[in-house]
Design a protein with these regions (language model features):
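Generic hydrophobic transmembrane alpha-helix motif, especially the helices
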Residues: 182-215
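C-terminal transmembrane helix and the adjacent membrane-cytosol boundary/short C-terminal tail
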Residues: 67, 231-232, 267-270, 311-351
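Transmembrane alpha-helix signature in integral membrane proteins
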Residues: 52-62, 134-164
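Transmembrane-helix boundary motif in ABC transporter permease subunits
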Residues: 69-77, 151-181, 194, 343-347
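Interhelical loop and adjacent transmembrane-helix boundary motif
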Residues: 283-332
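Transmembrane alpha-helices
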Residues: 249-287
């Protein structure tokens, strides 16, 4: 065989790369889906499984069986791979469908309540049966922002200081502090509300400040634990280099470690805010509810978005329920924005 013939054969034969997933053709993907759909329809008709949930269960089970049989045409490893891929996809869909259903339900039912005045008016002169074109949640939106701002001023500094003590100072009580913080993460929100009610509200009155203190108790462990994990990601070489240059532990912490972890600490703060933004139980016992716009955070009740939703649902009229759904849509949007900021800050942390 000549050199030219050998070269041409080598050019035609391409080396296989089994570590790279081969793209499946449309036919390979559509065939199992089509067969599983037919089997699912037959199962639903025969067994009487009702509704989309019954069809979904039948489809997942059918698709697992069909994927295994289809994979056995090649080999056992291929069959197991197809089954595991199906299980992972089904798990993702099972988690995603309820979440998407909640969002669609909230925004669909609350859409009719949302208009421009919904964000500029309060409920001071609006009754429960008044038209949806009257009233709004500006008082609740402003109240929530005030309560969350005050809670952040308490929880974020203390949470970061706690994380610094655990990861940087590593005092003899750091283990105890870590256990306490972890235990606080499991405290029911109503317990935090009862605690502030007994200490503050019973002696003075319902107020936005009392609500902020209750939310700060719930927010602090989230900020502390997330900040601890962020500070652990700071390379040890940075600390060693600072100490080698003669920097003290305080200077190293505040000039090297914290600036390096700044984006991650912002993420921790945003996650803490998102954790408490929708809490209702502690606000029932602390801030309560007011139908009027107010910036006063002491001496009187202060409205908030969770309490606005709760109050309208408790009223029970059709228009009040629609306003509650509208408030829920605004609250979900607010929390979604917080998570977007957390993700953006997290990218900076990874860099």
């Amino acid at each position: 065989m000549s050199n030219s013939e050998t070269t041409s054969i080598m050019q035609e034969v391409k080396p296989e790369k089994p570590w790279i997933n081969r793209k499946q053709s449309l036919r390979e993907v559509a065939r199992p889906l089509f067969i599983a759909t037919l089997i699912s329809v037959a199962i639903v008709l025969v067994t009487g499984l009702a509704g989309p949930l019954g069809f979904y269960v039948a489809f997942v089970l059918s698709f697992i069986v069909v994927s295994f049989v289809d994979g056995m045409r090649h080999d056992k490893v291929k069959a197991i791979d197809k089954v595991m891929t199906t299980l992972i996809t089904a798990g993702f869909a099972t988690a995603f469908i309820p979440w998407a259903s909640i969002l669609l339900t909230v925004f669909k039912r609350g859409a009719s309540a949302i208009y421009f005045g919904f964000f500029t008016n309060d409920m001071s002169v609006t009754a429960a049966d008044d038209d949806l074109g009257m009233g709004g949640l500006s008082h609740a939106l402003v109240g929530s922002l005030l309560i969350l701002l005050m809670a952040s001023l308490v929880a974020i500094p203390f949470g970061i200081i706690t994380a610094v003590y655990i990861t940087e100072i590593k005092g003899k009580f750091s283990g105890v502090v870590r256990v306490v913080v972890q235990s606080m993460s499991g405290v029911p929100s109503v317990v935090a509300g009862l605690f502030i009610y007994a200490i503050v509200v019973s002696r003075y009155s319902f107020s936005g400040l009392a609500g902020a203190l209750a939310l700060a108790i719930l927010m602090l462990p989230t900020v502390a634990r997330t900040s601890e994990e962020v500070l652990k990601l700071v390379p040890e070489d940075l600390r060693s280099s600072a100490y080698a240059l003669g920097a003290s532990q305080t200077a190293t912490t505040f000039r090297i470690v914290l600036p390096t972890a700044r984006s991650g600490l912002i993420t921790a703060s945003m996650l803490g805010l998102a954790r408490v933004a929708g809490e209702t139980a502690p606000l029932i016992l602390t801030a309560y509810y007011s139908a009027v716009y107010s910036l006063k955070v002491t001496g009187q009740p202060l409205a908030s978005l969770p309490m606005y939703i709760f109050q309208n649902f408790s009223t029970g009229t059709d228009t009040a329920l629609t306003r509650a759904w509208g408030g829920a849509a605004v609250l979900l949007s607010f929390i979604f924005i917080l998570f977007i900021f957390a993700r953006i800050a997290g990218r900076g942390s990874r860099k």
